[in-house]
Amino acid sequence: MNRWLRAALLAGVLAAPPPLAAHAIHTSVAEADYNAATRRLEVSLRVFIDDFEAALSVHALRRLSLAATPAAEFDAAARAYLAATFTVRTPDGQLAPLVWVGREVRDAENELWFHFEMPLPGGVEGCRVHHRALGEQFPTQINSVRVRDGERRLTLVFLARQTEKTVRFRP
């Protein structure tokens, strides 16, 4: 290939805009149901696969991909990441451990759902939820958690600088 053609191709590649992401807004949505019978908070967290892979790779200091990384290795890294970025503390400050249930992929929607539980013997009222998942990778990340305890419902929204909220149901 002649030198001018190579230079033109290189200039075209460098001048081209970056590939568009599948979505322009970075969000996660969680459903957190308090199960009074088991005294656990049952959480289902939805993230976009590409967003999660990017944040997980930075956190793990190595490239991790849902398609290429062995499932056990990916899940172990995902558990560690979620335990660091999605936490719940009881009203007296005790950290509720994250108990892994599993994950599911919805390829058509580019969605990855994580399922985990957190023991909360005293209930969810007054607990502090800290949710900063993906925020270190995407400054405009918006995370929401829909908390339910029987008939009581509450939605918590977490922005870049607002990563902790207290569960307070209206009377």
Q: At which residue positions do the language-model features occur?
A:
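N-terminal soluble domains immediately following signal/targeting peptides that reside
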Residues: A22-P171
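N-terminal signal peptide c-region/cleavage motif recognized by signal peptidases
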Residues: A16-P17
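Bacterial N-terminal signal peptides that target proteins for export
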Residues: M1-G12
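Compositional signal for N-terminal targeting/processing segments
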Residues: N2, L20-A22
